[in-house]
């Protein structure tokens, strides 16, 4: 029996719509878990005690005398639940390190491969991805380049540049440390360098601290979690600083 033209058209339309629908539906990407602080041990309660600063305000540190940071970051979250991205080479670099929220994610040696790629198999919500280049494979402080801007997944699950907007004010507890060592970014710890929770304040962020001066986020700490930053002061000045609740201003 011949099928009426209207029925033939309806059947073809239905099949076409079904096929189009099957092409338009992308694999579901599971929701990412919240990012956790890297230190899982106990952190003592640190109530505000008050204190005072050094008197002379600290100026902004100069971090320009290093290899430039890698750029041209491109990638995002895939259907496999991993974040994968590529980045551009830096002239003079022998290797690179990638970080998620201030924690080492991947070491990339440059042996001339066509593409430099980073993969995060365990991504989390609003993670800050950052990179630096190295002049040598030994990760010595003198070989480390400048830290890149942070990159976060946008609404389309693609990586996009991220920074805390200039002028943002943050009500934080501010503590002080006096360790004579290297910061996580390989700078000699000293005035103007600060430790942050890199989930909230990415490395490389500059901000002012009342009574202290200018801070450059270049370090992390086991007890530096959530609304705490740690400023560097020498010797007894660190003790005299105490624990203060202050309003930070992002530069």
Language model features by range: what are they?
Residues 34-62, 125-126, 151-251:
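Solvent-exposed, well-ordered loop and adjacent helix/strand elements within mature globular domains
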Residues 8-22:
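Sec-dependent N-terminal signal peptides
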Residues 97-124:
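Recognizes extended acidic, P/S/T-rich segments that occur
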Residues 21-30:
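C-terminal segment of classical bacterial N-terminal signal peptides
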Residues 59-91, 140-153:
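Pro/Thr/Ser/Gly-rich low-complexity, intrinsically disordered linker/stalk tracts
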Residues 120-140:
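Beta-strand-rich modules
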Residues 95-99, 206-208:
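Beta-strand signatures of extracellular beta-sandwich domains
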């Amino acid at each position: 029996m011949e099928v009426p033209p209207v029925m033939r058209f309806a059947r073809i339309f239905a099949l076409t719509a079904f096929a189009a629908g099957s092409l338009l539906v992308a694999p579901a990407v599971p929701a990412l878990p919240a990012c956790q602080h890297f230190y899982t041990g106990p952190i003592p309660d640190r109530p505000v005690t008050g204190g005072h600063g050094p008197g002379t305000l600290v100026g902004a540190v100069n971090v320009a005398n290093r290899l430039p940071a890698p750029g041209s970051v491109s990638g995002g979250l895939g259907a496999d639940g991993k974040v994968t991205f590529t980045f551009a080479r830096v002239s003079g670099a022998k290797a690179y390190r990638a970080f998620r929220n201030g924690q080492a994610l991947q070491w990339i040696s440059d042996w001339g491969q066509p593409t430099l790629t980073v993969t995060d198999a365990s991504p989390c919500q609003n993670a800050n991805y950052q990179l630096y280049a190295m002049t040598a494979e030994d990760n010595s402080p003198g070989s480390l380049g400048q830290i890149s801007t942070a990159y976060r997944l946008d609404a389309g699950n693609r990586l996009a540049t991220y920074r805390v907007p200039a002028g943002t004010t943050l009500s934080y507890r501010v503590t002080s440390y006096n360790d004579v060592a290297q910061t996580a970014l390989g700078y000699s710890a000293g005035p103007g360098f600060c430790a942050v929770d890199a989930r909230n304040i990415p490395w490389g962020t500059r901000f002012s601290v009342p009574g202290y001066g200018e801070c450059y986020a270049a370090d992390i700490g086991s007890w530096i979690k959530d609304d705490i930053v740690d400023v560097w002061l020498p010797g007894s000045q660190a003790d005299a600083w105490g624990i203060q609740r202050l309003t930070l201003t992002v530069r």
